Amino acid sequence: MAPRSRRRRHKKPPSSVAPIIMAPTTIVTPVPLTPSKPGPSIDTLGFFSLDDNVPGLSQLILQKLNMKSYEEYKLVVDGGTPVSGFGFRCPQEMFQRMEDTFRFCAHCRALPSGLSDSKVLRHCKRCRNVYYCGPECQKSDWPAHRRVCQELRLVAVDRLMEWLLVTGDFVLPSGPWPWPPEAVQDWDSWFSMKGLHLDATLDAVLVSHAVTTLWASVGRPRPDPDVLQGSLKRLLTDVLSRPLTLGLGLRALGIDVRRTGGSTVHVVGASHVETFLTRPGDYDELGYMFPGHLGLRVVMVGVDVATGFSQSTSTSPLEPGTIQLSAHRGLYHDFWEEQVETGQTHHPDLVAAFHPGFHSSPDLMEAWLPTLLLLRDYKIPTLITVYSHQELVSSLQILVELDTHITAFGSNPFMSLKPEQVYSSPNKQPVYCSAYYIMFLGSSCQLDNRQLEEKVDGGI
């Protein structure tokens, strides 16, 4: 167990609770806005790291969003009212300003403000995603860009189509699985199960007024229907990857979801992105993965949890078939002391961390260490996902050094199929959310460093 003084370093006062019911099968409760959040924020670190590759990029983003500081940006993201003139007069202005945040030379990293009067940033005509300040930079950059140009074309389309999720014009198709759950092992079998019904649903979205308005507002030609349908499918996998990956963990770790009173999953280090667009029905798919379950609680814990998402500390039994979403702002080891140890919330059957990033920063590793030790010492079944094979290797090495008992790792059959562009390094190979997973349970890892290297090098 982590030393108590270390684990209590980031204490914060408990928040108030106001439970409500948002849907017949999904219970959700709003979390009040808190003025400050403890510990390092991966969202904040990520924002300011943009300047490492493109000096001044963070300020360009704030400028295009009509904001004066990152604090004001976070205030708006957290549901507050900005002090300056944030907002857009029309959709065309919004999309243009969003696109302007990507305008810098991919080769020399020049921003618009640093160009001479004779130069202007123009995008690659193939992917419409990467900009150059002139033919010389574009020609010099082509050997690097050609490897990712096609994928970045998909990124550019997805970035616009994702707006349909924000507005609610693309509602994820859902319903009980017509196939036995054990027959659905990956996206191929999931899409086969959904079949023509899913295609009809996506086609209805494509002919909607919302899609017509979207592409009329962005100032570029509308792609072909098959391109747009492919984008909707990628967006669908991006949203459903998290609940289905949780299901993968419950399956692989042999957790009984038919226990009286329901089962509990804690999502640790939950980010703003994970919670901001999450809607009550998004986790229904997790329930359909386990027909006959007696209730599933999904509690998201993190310093960047979206304001207004949810918070609940109820220990009441769930109704069979119910999925309860809730959240808590703060670090997990503090949440454990304040909520779990005091009996205010349920002990987890599974803990999951999507892209914890503890391998990437000493500050993040320091914040994660008490939680990782807690999970190890309490022998809590734990699932971690990462973006890439490189992150997998680095994370495995850290977990081995912490003497965790790694039970499984590999490629995630329910990874997101939506490519993610590295914002400030656009020609870096795009990554995919939850591309790989690691599972561990307790201590005394059975793989030493040499065995681990052999397993990783042998292919996953």
Curated annotation (Swiss-Prot):
Pfam families: MSS51_C, zf-MYND. Gene3D superfamilies: 6.10.140.2220. The keyword Calcium does not apply. Disulfide bonds: none annotated. A zinc finger (MYND-type) spans 105-149. PANTHER family: PROTEIN MSS51 HOMOLOG, MITOCHONDRIAL-RELATED (PTHR46920:SF1), PTHR46920. This is Putative protein MSS51 homolog, mitochondrial. The gene is MSS51.
